[in-house]
Amino acid sequence: MRNKLLLASLCFPIWLTAQVAVPMKDMSFWKTSSATNWQIASDVTADFNKRNDMTASVGTGVLVNLPNEKNRDNLVSAAEYGDVDVSFDFMMARHSNSGFYLMGRYEVQLLDSWGVKNAKYSDCGGIYKRRRYTADSTEILWEGHAPLQNACLAPGLWQHMDISFQAPRFDAAGKKIANAKYIKITMNGILLHENVELTGPTGGPIEENEAATGPFMIQGDHGPVAFRNLKVSNFNGKAAELSDISFNVYYGAFKEAKDFLNNKPDSTGKLEKLTWEVSKEINDFAQVFKGTLKIPQAGKYKITTQMAGKNAVKVGDKVILPENFSHTSNKRIASVDLPAGDVPIEMTVYKTDGWMQPILGLWVESPNFRPVSFHSFSSLMAGTPNDPILLDAPQPTVFRSFMDFNVSQWGKVEKRIVHAVNVGSPDKLHFTYDMDNGALAQIWKGDFLNTSPMWDDRGDGSSRPRGALLLLNDAPPFTKSVKDTLAYTPQSEAQFRTLGYDLAENGMPTFRYRIYGSEVEDLVEITEGGKGLSRTISLKNTANDLFYRVATGKKMLQLADGSYLIDDKKYYVKLMNGAKGTVETVGDNSFLMVPVKDKLQYSIMW
């Protein structure tokens, strides 16, 4: 069997951390300032059509910067941090500019970069350049790191960023021995940076020197910006250690652990790091590893293992992972309360399946430190990884595949769309259309598709979006009543029948189907300027009392220009040609419903 999961095997397990939400009821998290540009609000709205325009509503829950000529201070946290994970939602006003500094020294740029084709270091999510001045005050910039993709959404929409940061390291004499590092930065679900070292502070730091800790700093002198759901995981604790590692190796096709545990081992020894490579064979062997975990403080710890074959783990006098069979790519996880001090650990594994490559890994983590690995790099080399099979869209591209809709971070799939049509464009705006119900299921910006799940090895027929994904609603959009907002209309009642699609000269498809006796043509195009989608629904033999569900979301707000902010400011919808909609609310969900005669046209911007 081909081994496809090396990269997944080398990844850290999912982190469980003591994540703390920054209070948004007052400014107590931040140092006091005489300037009044920073304030707490209940909500904010940025006018899509006005430069640097943002308004705040009285209340709590949102941190907002509204600078003017006299009040434009940066915001600095009262506490200092070293290794840290930070996540937050943020909103940019049109053409606004800000920056989030880790340790007050290393800036991640926040900017209205909506529609930028090729992002630079100065665009949203970029790591800003270093800066110095010559004797004649000439500015010199160097380094700087552009994001891998432009994942920036339109101004006035809530966006999300996750940052994992490692502080610089210093020896006892205060000499720097390791650079600061952005371990990972993602924005709107898209990877922007990974393992980027910073040789020194970026432009505009709180101080030019480097230190082991420092405060958060947010620029306040450039333009309006808002934050909510700011959460911090502080990794300031001493990490666990593993010492006194010994091993026993037994050769044979053992069916149970009792078949070898009382035997004399064929090989024994000591190790600095765990590795399965103490075995001379890649199959029909058993291994027992023993060591001492040095636990820095009493508390809850997560222990993760990765072993091929039957395996078990004992910590102290407790079996935390009973014997079970694991594939090469499987991780096993246990959460356990441990006392401070030395705690024995024992790992047993035996393997008789020749089709699996051997593998061995051990990680330990706590809320106070990131996962620490105690195995050699080569011990996780489960084979040569296959290159990803990526599909770009240098011209309008139509690609049929299965598409998993609404996949959770744990891999749970709400629905597999089996008659999905994925349409890509050189403007880097793409969408998935469900031919089983006429729904525009999802849209995304960035790169087009990862087709590895479809074409690698046996494949499962599916592909994955590669950009910043926005889920819409995979449900039949037509209903016979404005109150019929609950999505899934029975096909027997609607008499839905797909009629395929036609390709225009530019390569874009027009989808055709029949529903409620009406013949429908559905054309989705890229808007002028490549910043959104335009959708035109044309009907023949239109049924009476036919309504179209344009959008679904938790909250909807109609703006002064008649457009709508959908699903708590995730995207914009604008009805065209005088169409009038109504917002219907059922429980926590709202639906934008429009009566349809012969034609409906609307645009989506995000």
Identify the meaning behind each predicted range.
Residues 234-302, 306-394:
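Extracellular/secretory pathway-exposed regions associated with glycan biology
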Residues 198-206, 274, 313-334, 557-593:
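Solvent-exposed beta-strand/loop surfaces of large extracellular or lumenal domains
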Residues 1-20:
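Bacterial Sec-dependent N-terminal signal peptides
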Residues 178, 186-190, 194, 306, ...:
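Short strand-turn-strand beta-turns centered on an Asx-Gly dipeptide
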Residues 86-88, 159-165, 216, 230, ...:
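Short, well-structured beta-strand segments within conserved domains
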Residues 20, 26, 78, 378-523, ...:
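Beta-strand-rich N-terminal accessory domains
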Residues 515, 534, 542-553, 574-606:
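Beta-strand-rich recognition/accessory modules
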Residues 19-263, 268-273, 281-290, 294, ...:
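Carbohydrate-interacting regions of secretory-pathway proteins
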